[in-house]
Amino acid sequence: SVGFKAGVKEYKLTYYTPEYETKDTDILAAFRVTPQPGVPPEEAGAAVAAESSTGTWTTVWTDGLTSLDRYKGRCYHIEPVPGEEDQYIAYVAYPLDLFEEGSVTNMLTSIVGNVFGFKALRALRLEDLRIPPAYIKTFQGPPHGIQVERDKLNKYGRPLLGCTIKPKLGLSAKNYGRAVYECLRGGLDFTKDDENVNSQPFMRWRDRFLFCAEAIFKAQAETGEIKGHYLNATAGTCEEMYKRAVFARELGAPIVMHDYLTGGFTANTSLAHYCRDNGLLLHIHRAMHAVIDRQKNHGMHFRVLAKALRMSGGDHIHAGTVVGKLEGERDITLGFVDLLRDDFIEKDRSRGIYFTQDWVSLPGVLAVASGGIHVWHMPALTEIFGDDSVLQFGGGTLGHPWGNAPGAVANRVALEACVQARNEGRDLAVEGNEIIREASKWSPELAAACEVWKEIRFNFKAVDTL
């Protein structure tokens, strides 16, 4: 018909296309959709595709000025979620032309920007994205990646060890630097600013950076190992963030840090570019992630936030522990840990991976395990996370009865014992406690740590299930 038909029509007439064959250049999304009572799943899935691409609530005559077929998102498959009533996985394909090159910000604004407040849905969760190689190639990704970081640090064949300096707020810069020095001298590779240490009245950023740099170089000179402290460059403005990163570089610090969700993807990508251009490693903290990813039926799964970070750029990112005080179920955690580190990841629904993902040689990100872990967890952590990880013990270092440096010694001895045992073919899952006990015979520091934390458990039911 020549005329334009005004009015409201069902989304599924335009946006539900089960016969569609996805293209290699499409961005694919898997949404967990909970429709309102009476809304059929096809309509709900189509509504998601429409509202996150070209659609609006009514027909508009300007639709005729473009080719909707070329630009619309399409819901191409719907399946019920096993064991859940009235919940569906809706698969949506987006043409690549809907997205600005090299902008995670634009990608997320399109895919999850508006549609989550949509009335026809009771709840909506983005479970996974398939990023096509054509789009990945528009991103720089991590400033350096796993191999380059190992070469810079000259550390191979084992996980790296870190420690978040506690109490996280309230120390003066001088005392803070002292704690950094003691931990690094004792045998850790890194120490870390807490995510909320920025520049507060009790410790301004410049003073902290100076004392931490002094601690790093003193510990390096004494141990003969390369050391680092994650200097948190997160700030209220991008200009201030740059100022902090520049000062870190001028001090000769090896690594800076950013809170990528509170700081935002635009700031994060800018900082990642600066870090690559200036030889700084970039540690990423995921503060605020649980606001977005903790609810099972609404929000975004962390694997999406992790993929977005690999595109935006970061050399380390916090990824749960499986064994500590914070959320993280084993198979699902390992699923997104692989998505961070590996170049090619096969679809595997049992691990929450909805799509095969090819990163086409984008550098990988080291997974950071942090939160309520101590020496007794070391065998499990070594087995679960493998070598390409950073194991961070805050209280598990600074809580040692003899002080910070002995706490660091205990962790390093425990780690080296676990790595050696693994390399000799022993089963860490079965013999873990025995390996730690053996090692503690030769290390009084480790023996004291074993005594303090022998009864600590964080046993709660996992929330992050399929």
UniProtKB/Swiss-Prot annotation:
Superkingdom, natural source: Eukaryota
GO biological process: photorespiration; reductive pentose-phosphate cycle
PTM note: The disulfide bond which can form in the large chain dimeric partners within the hexadecamer appears to be associated with oxidative stress and protein turnover.
Entry EC no(s): 4.1.1.39
Active site per UniProt: K166 (proton acceptor), H285 (proton acceptor)
Positions that bind Mg(2+): K192, D194, E195
Gene that encodes the chain: rbcL
Name this polypeptide is given: Ribulose bisphosphate carboxylase large chain
Cofactor notes: Binds 1 Mg(2+) ion per subunit.
Note: The basic functional RuBisCO is composed of a large chain homodimer in a 'head-to-tail' conformation. In form I RuBisCO this homodimer is arranged in a barrel-like tetramer with the small subunits forming a tetrameric 'cap' on each end of the 'barrel'.
Cofactors that this protein relies on: Mg(2+)
InterPro entries tied to this protein: RuBisCO, RuBisCo_large_chain_AS, RuBisCO_lsu_C, RuBisCO_lsu_C_sf, RuBisCO_lsu_fd_N, RuBisCO_lsu_N_sf, RuBisCO_lsuI
Residues modified to N6,N6,N6-trimethyllysine: K5
Site for Transition state stabilizer, residues: K325
Places the protein is found: Plastid, Chloroplast
GO cellular component: chloroplast
Organism, scientific name: Adenium obesum
Subunit organization: Heterohexadecamer of 8 large chains and 8 small chains; disulfide-linked. The disulfide link is formed within the large subunit homodimers.
